[in-house]
Amino acid sequence: MSLFDLFRGFFGFSGPRSHRDPFFGGMTRDEDEDDEEEEEEGVTWGRGNSRFEGPQSPEEFSFGFSFSPGGGMRFHDNFGFDDLVRDFNNIFSEMGAWTLPSRPPELPGPESETPGERRQEGQTLRDSMLKYPDSHQPKIFGGGLESDARSESSKPAPDWGPQRPFHRFDDTWPVTPHSRAREDNDLDTQVSQEGLGPVLQPQPKSYFKSVSVTKITKPDGTVEERRTVVDSEGRKETTVTHQEAGSSPRDGPESPTPPSLDDSSSILDLFLGRWFRSR
């Protein structure tokens, strides 16, 4: 397989293939043939040589030069660069018809303003700047309506079939991107009618609770337990419990005493007490 066939097959092109192999033809020659050429004597090396007479095989290296009687040198450039340049021109000309837009974008100038484009009496600046179809009249760009420009831009790409350039990359590079509706929305009216709930996206909330327990044993044996709870909203609640030596704990004046979760009996009573009471 020649370089041209490999290049065309990789990019998905088909067509007439050159039977010459100018790049790899010189690599397939034997060293014996090179030695024979060095031993040959003559003024002309190229088309005047016997090697270039008659039909040449694709493996022949078709580049030579000869000396004219006036002392000049003439090159016979049959290396295949003309075919290479012609193939590249054909490839990139086909690519241009597929990728380039139909016409370059034009920006309206101050002189292209028409009476239909001017803002109507009583029409607000916001309404005049809304994109079509939210506004009542389509915009005019460069002397043509926006609907005409959209119809031209929405024309399908030429059907290349299986021989389209780079058709093997369709999974990675989609030819026609998915169209999205880009329209202006009147959020003021929507908020006044429905409120901010449907407009604003719901934000996820996190619920957590931070618990800090501090125990202080006084010299007389009294144990003071301070329990501070901070929730996700930032609310803080502090519970103080006093327990005298050899007596049950009693609550402080700040808040009622919650069940203690320090020992295993309190944990079992908390989780299983209600279930046994309901039986």
Curated annotation (Swiss-Prot):
Residues 175-206 are annotated as: Involved in CASP9 binding. The lineage of its organism: Eukaryota, Metazoa, Chordata, Craniata, Vertebrata. The modification N-acetylserine is found at S2. It is found in: Mitochondrion matrix; Endoplasmic reticulum; Nucleus membrane; Cytoplasmic vesicle. Residues 2-42 are annotated as: Required for localization in mitochondria. GO terms for cellular component: actin cytoskeleton; apical plasma membrane; cell cortex; clathrin-coated vesicle; mitochondrial matrix; mitochondrion; nuclear membrane; P-body. Residues 270-279 are annotated as: Required for ITGB6 binding. Recruits the Arp2/3 complex to the cell cortex and regulates reorganization of the cortical actin cytoskeleton via its interaction with KCNC3 and the Arp2/3 complex. Slows down the rate of inactivation of KCNC3 channels. Promotes GNA13-mediated cell migration. Involved in the clathrin-mediated endocytosis pathway. May be involved in internalization of ABC transporters such as ABCB11. May inhibit CASP9 and CASP3. Promotes cell survival. May regulate intracellular calcium pools. Residues 30-42 have a biased composition (Acidic residues). Residues 57-67 have a biased composition (Low complexity). Belongs to the HAX1 family. One of its GO terms (biological process) is negative regulation of apoptotic process. Residues 217-239 have a biased composition (Basic and acidic residues). Residues 210-279 are annotated as: Mediates interaction with UCP3. This is HCLS1-associated protein X-1. Interacts with ABCB1, ABCB4 and ABCB11. Directly associates with HCLS1/HS1, through binding to its N-terminal region. Interacts with CTTN. Interacts with PKD2. Interacts with GNA13. Interacts with CASP9. Interacts with ITGB6. Interacts with PLN and ATP2A2; these interactions are inhibited by calcium. Interacts with GRB7. Interacts (via C-terminus) with XIAP/BIRC4 (via BIR 2 domain and BIR 3 domain) and this interaction blocks ubiquitination of XIAP/BIRC4. Interacts with TPC2. Interacts with KCNC3. Interacts with XPO1. Interacts with RNF217. Coiled coil: none annotated. Keywords: Acetylation, Cell membrane, Cytoplasm, Cytoplasmic vesicle, Endoplasmic reticulum, Membrane, Mitochondrion, Nucleus, Phosphoprotein, Sarcoplasmic reticulum. The modification Phosphoserine is found at S192. It is a peripheral membrane protein. Residues 183-279 are annotated as: Required for localization in sarcoplasmic reticulum.
